Amino acid sequence: MKKNLRRFVGGTLLLIATACGKNNTDPDPTPDPEPGVDPTPEIVVRDLSANGTSNCYIILQTGACSFDATVKGNGAATEGLDAPEKMSPDSAALVWETSKGMITDVKLKDGTISFKAGDVNGNALIAAYSADKRVIWSWHIWFPEENVKTVTAKSGYEVMNMNLGAMTSTFGSAPDVKPYGLLYQWGRKDPFPSAPSLTGNEKTQPVPVYGPDGAEVKITYSLWSSVENNTIEYSIANPTKCLSNYAQYNTSRDWLKASDSNDALWGNPKGGERNSDNNYVNKGSKSFYDPCPVGYRVPPADVFRTFTTTGGYTQDPSSFDVVDLNGDGVIDTRDYNYGWSFNMKEGSLFFPAAARYDGSYAMLMGSKSGLWGSYWGNSPAKSYGATTGFGFCVLAFMNGAAGTSVSATASAGRADAYSVRCVKE
């Protein structure tokens, strides 16, 4: 503020302009703005289903996420399966997570499930519920420690660099269970946690999982005495229950009761058929029960046929198309490291021996951890005599006291829970 001071000098009136500021200092010509409230920062919600829906969504960073909860899987009609009707869930909640705090603030609004991803990696299962609190669908949320990418196999397929649900594609400075991933009964979309240790025994329990309250959620199993409840509807409503085939083992190895058995669940009911050149001709397509994330699917029967020189089963390590890990110029069991590194078109990919759930007892076989590796394909396998309910294994290997073998075309009971290595659609 300027003031005019009057002073008489030699009888003359002088007007002197002076400036006044705080503490007699020169003022800032621009006045300080009035204090205000900072605007609320906009919360960016990542729509995980923006490029398509699936039963599994990958997240690679923390923050708010959402996905369409009205569509079952990819919502597609495939051979043997009609397109599913859309859902109208009443609520949503976390079922389990492998790392506490990985998923919080699960909400449902206008057919969209939203949640916040914490700063811990892991796997989780989120479910949508009906008004009577029954699970009507569930989704696997996968937060790996490294980026998911593909490598071209010698068969031409673009193969995911890690198991479905794995944290890493290879071991770090020392072997650990991070590459093991999750395990699936053939045809089911919901995963089960694998072994918590590289090796185990009959008493080994799966990796612990936790509910929204932090309490441990138990992975249970169905009755051994009956398969009457073993239906698709029951499996969807009970995503934490491994379904046993014990009561029908001699006639069907399916987790579904034999009368409900369905070859089309993973989108390739005729995938086991071969032509006159002995090649698999039906590749199938992704079904709405497929457990793989957007853009990926469970692989067809011929994906890993180059993993052995025979294209099938062999006990001769020199016939395994694997990396010579110790560099001695010989392929043998010394190149095995809780799994095999199979050669691809360029480079290699590691396939760990992530154990399995036995389909009869519907429990983890921890004694096979680090010794047996089995990987599902999307097609059924042929019956053995009068026994039905087999699924196609695109890769099965073992290494232990019982011997060493690799098979690129195997089969097993659908009630067994095995690894899945997805391929690009």
Predicted feature locations:
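Intrinsically disordered, low-complexity sequence elements enriched in Ser/Thr/Gly/Pro
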Residues: 1-5, 20, 186, 251, ...
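Bacterial Sec-dependent N-terminal signal peptides
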Residues: 1-5, 15-44, 422
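N-terminal processing/targeting junctions
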Residues: 11-14, 192
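Short, compositionally biased
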Residues: 38-286, 312, 381, 414-416, ...
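C-terminal, surface-exposed recognition/capping segments
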Residues: 148, 166, 252-425
